[in-house]
């Protein structure tokens, strides 16, 4: 019998637990939230006429600033490369340790953990929350819920507010928000992120992971028998029962592993799509084993191949052999390869870029003296920290006369970290070869007119269209 595609949500009230994995999750939460909230306020001196915010996505200026690095619009391949690295990183972690990203560092997990912390501080732990949930709307329930929702809303507002600071100068935007003079886009973005954070982390929680996120389904293609996941050693724990009963396994069916699970699953039923590999059930089970005097590890991180070995009474392989195998090594090599390529491209990129766009409406113009003229839009990017002066030249011109609109010469000054826009005209005399046909081996060259060497710094191929081309 097939299961329904969607099941109505049953509220989950995870019990507070302490242990190594819970501590690791708290540290990751604190560090990741600290980085997210504080990064927009870091300053970085880039000189005059440039923003001093260390990390800034300047949509209006069409540039991305990352400390001492500037990414220009034509360098979007750097962003694509970073996205590829992020994807390969997820493949690597999933192949090695299952959904460890989901359980420890995913924003949905981080904010849900923070909301759960607030919920416990106000309403109490699991049993108190269940009692409050079931009781009628008394004065106690009303004020506790209102207080909890208010704190959630404040966290959500802080989340949305921090995000918009990445897209504008943080102190300036904060002043605009306080004085109610900020751009409407900022207010809309904050509202949307506040609302989604409040709903996703406060009310939907595990449903986002199960129904909205595609990663649980993708991970199936990335995991194999060598992938380390959370597993229940049923050959040791079964049959379940009280410790006073003879012939029973180590599992006393205390339900601690179920009660601490933020996804509400029972790991003893085997690996499930909803499991986010957070390890909280391991902390809960280890605590129970300590109390009843049994060895830890009834629930633990375990590869399927190790499970087969342990069932047979053999010694499992060392963890490093699980992590460093052909699949994970391939992902690691690809990840490192993309990273090295990006670093090399960043270090070797030129300080000047020239982009040429032929004006095609009209394709050419016949002047009063019978000569043919083509027009080109030139975009000169000076990506250095100094003002530069360039001189335009044309190779393979075969008698073409270059000129710049609004200028008597061919020199073009471009300020530091700026883009210069010019219109270049190439004119072919009447009866010349370019005027009567197409000249395709043309090169528009940019020379350094202000430096001591004065050599070419950029060149782009172009075509000249005559009357019969």
Curated annotation (Swiss-Prot):
First-listed, main subcellular location of the protein, grouped into a coarse class: membrane
CC per GO annotation: plasma membrane
Spans through the membrane: 24-44, 76-96, 150-170, 184-204, 328-348
Membrane topology: Multi-pass membrane protein
Record InterPro entries: 4Fe4S_Fe-S-bd (IPR017896), 4Fe4S_Fe_S_CS (IPR017900), Cyt_c_oxidase_cbb3_FixG (IPR014116), Electron_Trans/Redox (IPR051684), FixG_C (IPR032879), Ig-like_fold (IPR013783)
Binding sites annotated in the UniProt record for [4Fe-4S] cluster 1: 251, 254, 257, 285
Pfam families: Fer4_18, Fer4_5, FixG_C
Binding residues annotated for [4Fe-4S] cluster 2, in chain numbering: 261, 275, 278, 281
NCBIfam families in the record: ccoG_rdxA_fixG
Name of this chain's protein: Protein RdxA
Organism, as annotated: Cereibacter sphaeroides (strain ATCC 17023 / DSM 158 / JCM 6121 / CCUG 31486 / LMG 2827 / NBRC 12203 / NCIMB 8253 / ATH 2.4.1.)
Lineage: Bacteria, Pseudomonadati, Pseudomonadota, Alphaproteobacteria, Rhodobacterales
Gene name for this UniProt entry: rdxA
